[in-house]
Structures are given as structure tokens and as C-alpha cells.
């Protein structure tokens, strides 16, 4: 159903099961899948592709040009998966030349009121951005991470899976999987113990992970040497393997360490 006050380009490709409410604007190159609910006063423009069962609340702006002075009207893309919720005043921008011309959001995410996803961001599934959380360009967030209200993430930062960022925080370096961070230019406070419990880990398993994390971040040597000297073979614990893989992969901003480091 398309409301009579909505402006929908005849060049767009929209499944007939999708609802488009009052005063929405849908641009020429937009592709929208099944059973999406575009409630009212929503703008979806650019080369934006949306899969199924997403909800877009009033005054969200999806696919407008990147806020990057280097952007010069290149053809760039925004890809959105399924079962996401974009609350009021959420803004999402497509990519730029410097980031592969593509912003990607996967599935089952919640973007609360006023949150912002900048150009070239990569958001994995089951991520939550609370009210007014903002991502600068090229940020990568892995699955099940949570960002508190009014938090801000620096360009090129990576947030690992199941990480938790407290409200009003400013993050300028990468956050490891399962890390808990709060403050501005601070250190990790601990592991995200609640996130680990939600994942179904026992207390014994969590304690073992904490002990191994302490070895990796031992301040008496570098992280690289701690991994090399203590993890000759790949750890049998999945969560530790994920942390080591994260630390061994390319970082453009450096790694946020723990308070006692």
C-alpha cells in the first residue's frame, strides 16, 4: 500500500507487500523488498537496497549523500538487510570512494532515535545503537554489540562482537570482542560479562576467558608477544580465538587496552 501523499519514483523497485505511509519520499534508484513498513515522513534516496521486514519511523533519512567534503557525486551504495528497526530521526549515508563506495547494514539491528551511521560503515547483525549514538565514517561493528546513548565512535574504529559501549562515551581505538568500555579516551573497564552470560556461557567458562584475556593484555610485554609466547596453538575456546583473530587483523586506529595496562 502506498499512501496518496507519498512521493514514490516510478523508477524505484518496491515489492507490493511493502507499506509506504504519508509524506514519504522514495527516490529513483531505491529497491525495497517484502513486508517493509515505512511509516510516515521517511526519506529513502540514492542507490539504496533494502531487503525484508524492516521498519522505518518518522523523519528517518536513509541513503542521502555522505557528509564527506571529498564526495563528488560518485555513484555510491547503501545495502540494508532484513528485520531492522530505524527509529525517528535516524540518518544513514551511503559509501564514498575511500571506503569502497558502500555502506552495509545486516540483519536484526535496532537504531534508536537520532542515531547516525556515516559513510562506509559496516554493521553486522543484532547490533543496537541507543539514542543519539553516532558512528563516523568507516566504522565496523560486529554482531551483538551495543552502543549506549550519546556515544560517539571515531573514524575507522572497529567494535568487536558482543562489546558494550557505555552511554556518553567517546571511542577512538578498536574495542576487542566482549570488551566493556565507558568514558572518553579511556581504557577497557572489563569484559562484557552480561553479554557473555547472554551468549549462554557458564561462570567457569567466563572465568577461564577472563584469565586468558589477562595473559593477552599482560602489561609486562606487548600484546603481540603475549599471544606469540602463550598461544602457540590456536586456543580451543571460541571467544579467545575470536579475540586473537581480532587483534591479529589490521587496525587503523590501534587497540583499546585495559585499565591496568
What do these predicted regions represent?
Residues 1-5, 10-11, 16, 53, ...:
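Terminal amphipathic alpha-helical/low-complexity segments used for targeting or macromolecular assembly
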Amino acid at each position: 500500500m502506498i499512501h496518496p501523499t507519498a512521493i514514490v519514483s516510478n523508477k524505484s523497485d518496491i515489492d507490493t507487500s511493502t507499506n509506504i505511509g504519508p509524506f514519504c519520499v522514495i527516490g529513483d534508484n531505491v529497491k525495497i523488498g517484502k513486508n517493509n513498513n515505512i511509516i510516515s515522513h521517511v526519506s529513502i534516496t540514492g542507490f539504496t537496497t533494502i531487503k525484508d521486514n524492516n521498519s522505518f519511523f518518522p523523519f528517518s533519512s536513509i541513503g542521502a549523500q555522505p557528509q564527506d567534503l571529498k564526495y563528488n557525486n560518485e555513484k555510491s551504495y547503501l545495502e540494508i538487510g532484513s528485520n531492522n528497526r530505524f527509529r525517528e530521526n535516524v540518518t544513514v549515508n551511503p559509501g564514498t570512494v575511500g571506503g569502497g563506495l558502500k555502506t552495509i547494514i545486516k540483519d536484526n539491528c535496532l537504531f534508536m532515535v537520532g542515531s547516525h551511521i556515516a559513510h562506509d560503515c559496516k554493521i553486522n547483525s543484532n547490533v543496537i545503537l541507543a539514542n543519539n549514538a553516532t558512528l563516523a565514517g568507516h566504522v565496523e561493528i560486529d554482531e551483538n554489540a551495543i552502543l549506549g546513548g550519546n556515544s560517539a565512535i571515531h573514524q575507522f574504529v572497529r567494535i568487536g562482537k558482543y562489546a558494550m559501549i557505555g552511554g556518553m562515551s567517546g571511542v577512538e581505538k578498536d574495542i576487542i570482542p566482549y570488551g566493556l568500555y565507558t568514558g572518553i579516551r579511556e581504557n577497557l573497564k572489563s569484559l562484557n560479562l552480561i553479554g557473555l552470560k547472554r551468549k549462554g556461557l557458564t561462570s567457569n567458562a567466563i572465568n577461564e576467558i577472563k584469565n586468558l584475556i589477562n595473559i593477552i593484555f599482560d602489561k609486562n610485554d606487548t600484546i603481540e608477544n603475549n599471544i606469540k609466547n602463550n598461544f602457540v596453538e590456536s586456543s580451543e575456546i571460541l571467544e579467545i580465538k575470536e579475540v586473537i583473530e581480532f587483534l591479529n587483523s589490521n587496525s587503523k586506529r590501534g587497540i583499546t587496552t585495559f585499565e591496568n595496562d
